[in-house]
């Protein structure tokens, strides 16, 4: 949903710790699929989350390097501040840039990795294959591209939540998202551009107390800028989603990891 909009933490200290442990566990599960990446030059594409960067840095170690590509310049600045307190092994460099036109030298990295990039990708002007091609261009020959993302292989409240977020953004900015779909769509995307593609589908990873955090959120301020009819529709859908969360909890989606090798 529209996360981090609640005024006060609705969780106790113990509940907050359990929630954060589950987030770390989910991150670790996804990063473990990369295998041994010690000493590699790695690009993390499409984000500046300290949780993911810290996990990658620790796996890469002091003999490797990590660059993170983030489109939002404000998030780059915030990420730089947060990383000062992170437990890093490999040095991390944050770069502002677009995955369609990464401001990086070609043939630079041993591995390009993304988590959640494609379902948030705005394909209004350029396509998902163009994004994957651009990312592969900065990988050395015989290097690897690996992506993790949500798929709709199991029913989940999260799917409705993500769709509602995307619709609000579309109403505000006109963005068109690649979105969440079947595992086959992502596998086919990678097979068209990479060699020796392999993949793994992982079951949903529950996050304790996530439902309570979402139910505690305030109404997004962005709703006020919508036309009255669109705003009313969005509020009604948000309320229906909240009722579903109260009844079902915040059930999460499965994730798909796909990787392939670059050859030229």
Language-model region placement:
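A short acidic, Gly/Pro-enriched loop at the edge of an enzyme's catalytic core
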Residues: 100-112
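Class I SAM-dependent methyltransferase SAM/SAH-binding core
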Residues: 43-44, 48-101
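Conserved alpha-helix/loop element of class I SAM-dependent methyltransferases that forms part
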Residues: 19-40, 55
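Class I SAM-dependent methyltransferase Rossmann-like catalytic core
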Residues: 1-25
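Conserved class I S-adenosyl-L-methionine
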Residues: 146-168
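A short, conserved alpha-helix within the catalytic core of class I
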Residues: 121-134
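Short alpha-helix
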Residues: 178-193
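Conserved Class I S-adenosyl-L-methionine
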Residues: 196-264
